[in-house]
Amino acid sequence: MPKFSLRTLLLLFFGFGIALAFVCQVIFPIREQARRCSCSNNIKQITLALLNCESVYGHLPIGIETSPDGSPYRSWRRLTFFYMEGLPPVFYDLYDENSAWDSKSNTRFYDGTPVVQTDKFGSNRRVDSLDPCPVSWCCPSDSTKRVNYAVVVGEETAFPPNRNVKFDEITDGLENTILVVETLSGSDKWTEPRDLQFDSMSFVISKSKNGEIGSRHPGGANVGFADGEVHFITDAISPEELRALLTIAGNEPITRQQLIDRGVIR
């Protein structure tokens, strides 16, 4: 067995330290940048799906539909099926619009029940189970496999309870109004009508599962605006500024461009 001098060992440890520092300072940030870019693309796709819904129906979908007894009934996410890339065709046909999200016919979207899937020509039949959180709804920086993209539900937002919003109601400007946010508070069942609640938010960018906008990305979170643009909001944004971007007709003297100019939004 070869013997190493103290000097050789010190040089080896020094070289290892340099290599480790290189990985931490160069490789890891590059990987995170790629994950953040993928997350931004997810939000872009979801935001454009909502804009397509608005174009087809003349209004945005209801964020959380409730039943007569007040319990959550359906989520806005199911209406994006037709406009999302990468979702299996079976999604378009299986969802039962006449029953609740957690009814027997709709639990197969997340409980592992085998379903028959085919390609768009009706061939290549196979039996499979659906992913409870499809990749389009999960941020690659979050390993928990939960829904990372939500809307903010509230009377002052684009998603008031049990009511559709038309774009002409967004008097603050489409470019100044957030539709889709990143969060760590999502469900592990992507069809569950569960989103962020405007009235209980503190309007800070968070790294906890506490009903706030937040992410695993260092320094902030991605959001999608009503004009289709996706931006990274840094945690330097004030609660007043973030709140203003979530209201549709608050008439606040705060614009996205001002925040971009200040470096608060990228």
Predicted regions located by residue number:
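Surface-exposed loop/linker segments characteristic of extracytoplasmic
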Residues: T8, Q25, P29-R266
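Hydrophobic membrane-insertion alpha-helices, especially the h-region
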Residues: L9-C24
